[in-house]
Swiss-Prot record:
Predominant subcellular localization, coarse grouping: cytoplasm
Localisation per UniProt entry: Cytoplasm
Keyword Phosphoprotein in record: yes
Species of provenance: Desulfosudis oleivorans (strain DSM 6200 / JCM 39069 / Hxd3) (Desulfococcus oleovorans)
Post-translational modification: 4'-phosphopantetheine is transferred from CoA to a specific serine of apo-ACP by AcpS. This modification is essential for activity because fatty acids are bound in thioester linkage to the sulfhydryl of the prosthetic group.
Protein name: Acyl carrier protein
Amino acid sequence: MSIEDKVKRILAERLEVDPSEIRPDAEFISDLGADSLDIVELLMSLEDEFDIEISDDEAEQIMTVKDAVEFITKRL
């Protein structure tokens, strides 16, 4: 499973959205309906899944699916 597929799976589970709605340019808040608590839980899930750490400053830069995939790719 690719990084993007794993990110989409986590998003679909955490935000209870249809995976087909999750596009690379989808913004977590405006397109996928996430709130601030959802974002925190999502980032924690990504940290656990990929065994990485995301600082608060870095988290502020991760706004879309593509942002998350690119960030994780750089860390692995």
